[in-house]
């Protein structure tokens, strides 16, 4: 099991790389994360939902995503409330107090049953399981009935490797401090340390490594270098090194708005990778609406709390900036929650995402959305119609809203839909062709669809060519090669 001294220490990446290394050896290996809290998710083959990071790790193993890889997924809708997804299905939304409960006796106390059920099924099907912890095992206030870190490791008698991010500074305090806050049995469970994202001369670090091993009695199993431009599916929130695309000098500007509860920002990885695109995220809580000036394409992403994020967007003045953007010839796209925002009205009569009520939307498209408790989870393929010829497109849907298009569409966005539902349920385009929205996450992953959207938005450069899947494979191979070089694989293999 890989645990970390903090969030974003490198647990997801380390598990993915080790999964690929074991899979290369022809071993049957699978990823496992008992509990994940994230707004980036993926749809499984059987119509369930898991964390995006576990879908990435499954790909590293050569597997399709499965709900057992992430039995508990928490999707925050506010600072204190989250949707609880068990074995791929949304069961309820709970306040934090109800999840943890008084003296640790809330829902969390029984969630371990679902976790162990998935773990035992996987154990029967695979030779090796690589388990990822969550956050830090040393969160004192979360120790009671823990299912994400040491609580799980102790329940299944699993050895633990502790990883820390040296790039943030204070790596020795992170490791020694975490160890000091664990019980004796938990300390004994940690078999070694991995230091992640190191830049510089390893010889200058060596005295610190020698001290760490002498002080703790535990080996340093490797120092992983900082991998520049490693772009793999992010687990959750954007961090600074993920936010902008590569500086290619491109002049075609794409801007994606980021609201407080943005979800599935991995949709935009293909745009960040595109050499002809000047890509950036704009955090609406801190950026000025004037930052949209000069943008060729603006995208509204998904949201876990659409009405609250819409209100934030309006309060910060981005509604007026979007109208100005379109008025002066810019193109506008909404994905999932962003699609709902482009409509006329969003109704939440039962309080699915937040307080029951109704919100006026941005009125760019003739849509009305009603949020419902039942969630749509589907892998979808079809044809996207933006230019003279339709192009193949595939992706996935994750949403609670049912959107109705008012009137007859003069231009359907999707020509073919393989779910048996009307194509208009997937998305629509404005009569003037300047704005479109859809429920399809991953719409940019297919090179032909990405090229079609960029051409529609006015891009006249070269086509992309490489799919996100091909790029992901290249990055996983690069990651695995790096781990093979910089980790003590003999010691690691002895733990399996």
Swiss-Prot record:
Q: Which GO terms describe its biological process?
A: cobalamin biosynthetic process
Checking InterPro entries in the record gives: Class_I_gatase-like, CobQ/CobB/MinD/ParA_Nub-bd_dom, CobQ_GATase1, CobQ_N, CobQ_synth, GATase_3, P-loop_NTPase
Q: Which UniProt keywords apply?
A: Cobalamin biosynthesis, Glutamine amidotransferase
User: Short name of one Pfam family for this protein?
Assistant: GATase_3
Pathway(s) of this molecule: Cofactor biosynthesis; adenosylcobalamin biosynthesis
Q: Name one GO molecular function term.
A: catalytic activity
Q: Where is the active site?
A: 336, 441
Superkingdom field? Bacteria
* Protein family according to the UniProt entry: Belongs to the CobB/CobQ family. CobQ subfamily.
State the name under which the record lists this protein.
Answer: Cobyric acid synthase
State the species of origin.
Shewanella amazonensis (strain ATCC BAA-1098 / SB2B)
